[in-house]
Amino acid sequence: KIAWVLTNLLSNAIRYSPENGHVVIGAHQTDDNYIEMYVQDFGKGIDPRYHKSIFDHYFRVPGTKVQGSGLGLSISRDFVEAHNGTLTVQSELGRGSKFIMRLKA
């Protein structure tokens, strides 16, 4: 299920990136013995007022032109939480988004 989450995050990052844009993926172990995996894009970003809502079932950011069901991030969060982890977002309009999955090592 964790592989599905990473695939979903990567797919989203590619779809929300500008043409010929790039996506960064990475992972590292933290000092407090967690593994953090992240997927970062450099697309239009997500308005901070939607940072919590994007993880709700069927939620789509208003004005989004990219096709989708509004389920991918909510299912991803559910899978990560089932492994006692967290899935968060860091994003600014015009600067892209970084989704961070944090799991106990």
Predicted regions and their residues:
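Short helix-loop "hinge" at the ATP-lid/N-box region of the Bergerat-fold HATPase_c
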Residues: 13-14
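Short beta-strand/loop element within the Bergerat-fold HATPase_c
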Residues: 20-33
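Acidic ATP/Mg2+-coordinating residue in the GHKL
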Residues: 41
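Short helix N-cap motif at coil->helix boundaries in the Bergerat
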Residues: 45-53
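Glycine-rich ATP-lid/hinge loop adjacent to the conserved G-boxes
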Residues: 59-68
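Short alpha-helical Gxxx[C/S/T] motif in the catalytic ATP-binding
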Residues: 72, 76
